[in-house]
Amino acid sequence: MAVYVKFDVPQEMEEKTAEVLSKSEKVKKGANEVTKAVERGTAKLVVLAKDVQPEEIVAHIPIICEEKGIPYTYIATKEDLGKAIGLEVSTAAVAIIAEKDANALKDLVEKINGLKA
């Protein structure tokens, strides 16, 4: 497991995360954009790929998410993360800025918080 992966995410949770991402209204993609969104407090949920190399690219993101109280989770690969938001290329990190279905996001965040406990 990568250094920055703080908890294990079941497959069905990854699928639910991808579904919520695909229905999001506005997202920021890439480690730099996600870092800025977290620091500004505009991110509602951060999703990181588990296969980022070198790991240092995203290793700081879970730490600043915890400092800012922003929930975060993981998806297996950068390719899966890119596909979930409609990109033809892979991405290491995504932050949801605006969502269409607030209830689905809230439900997902509660499940993520349950994994950390």
Curated annotation (Swiss-Prot):
It comes from Methanococcus aeolicus (strain ATCC BAA-1280 / DSM 17508 / OCM 812 / Nankai-3). GO terms for molecular function: ribonuclease P activity; rRNA binding; structural constituent of ribosome. Belongs to the eukaryotic ribosomal protein eL8 family. Keywords: Cytoplasm, Ribonucleoprotein, Ribosomal protein, RNA-binding, rRNA-binding, tRNA processing. Part of the 50S ribosomal subunit. Probably part of the RNase P complex. Gene3D superfamilies: 3.30.1330.30. HAMAP family: Ribosomal_eL8 (MF_00326). GO terms for biological process: translation; tRNA 5'-leader removal. Multifunctional RNA-binding protein that recognizes the K-turn motif in ribosomal RNA, the RNA component of RNase P, box H/ACA, box C/D and box C'/D' sRNAs. The keyword Secreted does not apply. This is Large ribosomal subunit protein eL8. SUPFAM superfamilies: L30e-like. The keyword Cytoplasm applies. It is found in: Cytoplasm. Pfam families: Ribosomal_L7Ae. GO terms for cellular component: cytoplasm; ribonucleoprotein complex; ribosome.
